Each structure stands twice: as C-alpha cells, then as structure tokens.
Amino acid sequence: MRVRVHPRVQRRHSDVEEDDVIVAFEGTLRSRARDTHPIQWVGVGLDRKGRLLEYIAVEDEPDGWLVFHAMLVTRAVLAEVGLRR
C-alpha cells in the first residue's frame, strides 16, 4: 500500500509531520466512508508519538492513498467514526 500526504497538511498543522500521518493511517483504529464522490475515508489512528490523529483520505490509485487532511483528533471526528457519543 502506498500512502502520500498532501503538503497542505504540514503547512496548516506544523505539529503534524508526514511520518506521523503515515503511521496513523497505517495503524487506523477506526474509519468510515463518507458519502462523497470520490469516496473520502475519515479515520483515527495513533501517530509515532502516541497522539491520536484524525485524517481524511481518498484512494487515488489502486492500493494508493492520498491523505489531504490530518490533525490532532477532534470530538466531532471521534463521534463520526463511532469512538465517542
């Protein structure tokens, strides 16, 4: 599986590095598809520092993903993926 992180992520969230996003994506705890076209996946995973990150990604090639949003997890995303009421 190939995971790419859009440069915009680090420009907007300087505390989140590309490797953090990849580790969180590959170790996803919970994710769900959004009703969009193309289908966007919102997910939550732990980064290499043990922080809980949220991400939004699209499959942009066979077995290839582009993460275009990532940051420290919010309550809204925890609820969206079913990890919080």
Task: List PLM regions with ranges.
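Ribonuclease/tRNase effector modules and their secretory precursors
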Residues: M1-R85
